[in-house]
Amino acid sequence: MSDPLGDMLTRIRNAQRARHAVCVAPASNLRANVLDVLKREGFIRGFSKEELRPGVAQLRIELKYNDGEPVIKEITRVSRPGRRVYSKIKELPRVYAGLGVSILSTPRGVMSDVEARTANVGGEVLCRVF
């Protein structure tokens, strides 16, 4: 798999379109950090890490719906393995005039665009969520 984060985002997108309550993806620290931001911003209900066997784990993602409609309307990968996208804090665009969130990987960890502006730090733009 050349883009593990992109794979997880696609699994979430497909599960929400199929109205599944839970989605499963292989575990990694980056994926868990991105899910933590999605939970803080209210896009998912929660997630947990399940150990399948020693050294192999998966993330169980609890998706969130509002009156039967998915909370996540759009989730897209911005920075890809073949084309990395970096942004300074002053050049960081707002997603749908602040209704959506960009998730960044910064020297201070993975955080939302709002948290990055508060911390005055830029970084790699991983994805956009609306």
UniProtKB/Swiss-Prot annotation:
GO biological process: translation
CC annotations in GO: ribonucleoprotein complex; ribosome
Pfam families: Ribosomal_S8
Keywords: Ribonucleoprotein, Ribosomal protein, RNA-binding, rRNA-binding
InterPro entries: Ribosomal_uS8 (IPR000630), Ribosomal_uS8_CS (IPR047863), Ribosomal_uS8_sf (IPR035987)
Coiled coil feature spans: none
Record has Ribosomal protein as a keyword: yes
UniProt keyword Nucleus present: no
GO molecular function, one term: rRNA binding
Superkingdom classification of source: Bacteria
Disulfide bonds: none
Protein's job: One of the primary rRNA binding proteins, it binds directly to 16S rRNA central domain where it helps coordinate assembly of the platform of the 30S subunit.
Entry-linked HAMAP family: Ribosomal_uS8_B
Family: Belongs to the universal ribosomal protein uS8 family.
Family matches, as PANTHER family: 40S RIBOSOMAL PROTEIN S15A
SUBUNIT field: Part of the 30S ribosomal subunit. Contacts proteins S5 and S12.
Protein name: Small ribosomal subunit protein uS8
